[in-house]
């Protein structure tokens, strides 16, 4: 296991770090539960006006991304998955596929794309059954269903193998795919994945409750988001506006992600790069690192001691350097 000394970050980094957190904290701990209990069988927008407001915010945030080379709407048995391809400048033989955190949409990865494109070509998708431009049209009722739609989306892409990188719940989604359908996975990269190497602490669950309801004051969600981002203040940036709109206007209708067990982790055969935030409140970082180290048969575990759960916005260049080194080593085997 490697620990990384935190570099000094400019103020812009502290603006960035909060935008991930709202997507994965209040939405994960509240949105899934509310959606499963009361929503229609599929995820849906609460109103036409809410959908329009979200898509306007999505497009504004998307404008900060590099221009995609291609846009795919991939039909699966569970709905249509929006996938973007970005042409990279690096030497990687296989493309990266990026999975965002919950309730965010793929523009949450805006800070990561420039440095990851120096590794190679990148695909990024909106998770099915979540706010974004993917459209769910069949119930997703199990972990197997969650793996099935992602497997079908990858099968529709022209390449045969990929390095799959998941952020927060995207890390769980990537690992869940590896447990059910690993045919197209050259490697697995998890970025402070939740429900994967440790449970969500009860204290975090309790603190999330006021943020879980869309009719509660925005200040309550901001307070919880600041807590998960290590105390960083919430600022109005395009991605944060998109996330807030998604939490307000979209109702998810699928079960919460099941904790992946150590026994399941031990069955994974792909090389795994597990990147963990040392100050994450979404699991016990030491316990998570120990689990990854003791269960994964082919793993590299990297811990950033001063990173919060919003690690993707705090350390984008450092993460890309690790990904570059890891994928280069995997492809050289």
Set out the residue ranges of the language-model regions.
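Conserved HGGG/HGGXW glycine-rich cap/lid loop of the alpha/beta-hydrolase fold
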Residues: 54, 82-132
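Active-site loop/oxyanion-hole signature of alpha/beta-hydrolase fold enzymes
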Residues: 124-165
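Conserved loop-alpha-helix segment in the C-terminal half of the alpha/beta-hydrolase fold
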Residues: 273-307
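Conserved alpha/beta-hydrolase catalytic His-Asp/Glu region
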Residues: 199-205, 213-269
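Gly/Ala-rich beta-loop-alpha elbow adjacent to hydrolase catalytic centers
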Residues: 166, 170, 174
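Alpha/beta-hydrolase fold catalytic core
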Residues: 2-94, 119-120, 328-333
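Catalytic active-site module of serine/aspartate enzymes centered on a nucleophile-bearing elbow/loop
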Residues: 299-333
